[in-house]
Amino acid sequence: MPNHCNNTLTIKSDNTGFLQSLLNELKEADGGMPKFLEKLAPFTADINYEWDYNWCVQHWGTKWDIFDVNYASLDGDTLEVVFTTAWSPPIEALVTGMLNHGYTFNLYYEEGGCCFIGHTEGDGESHYDQTWETYTDNAPSTYIPDDVLDAFPWVESDWHDWQREQAEEEQELQDA
């Protein structure tokens, strides 16, 4: 079973037909695994246009397409999607899609099992990505931007729980 990466994505594009096709793919999947990333970065001839673990990790940034779509909405030129991926965010697929389809995007992601949180944005020509560890000696609010923490409000409370557990374990060792 993979570690699940939570993702909150916003794509903006003048090509509303393309955005509608992405939303339609999410609706047609009807709870199954949509071919969302496959629309952004399609399989290629070298893998016979079929799923391949190494290819997906290299070209999508994750081994499977998105799943557990919790929210999807299209409003004019803006598509918003909240979903899950395996182990890591689909940054490579989003960048490929951005370069091929001319959209901009913002992606916030959090992977609790691997203890990281991040933000990626693409402006249509290039992208910027920043990732932070969530379990350090310092509270996440002291080094992670508010907009990133706002996307995943449980990160701060999880850190406080972890700090409390660490203190309890240390006390047990001292008492032994």
Predicted regions, residues:
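Long, contiguous binding/interaction regions
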Residues: 1-176
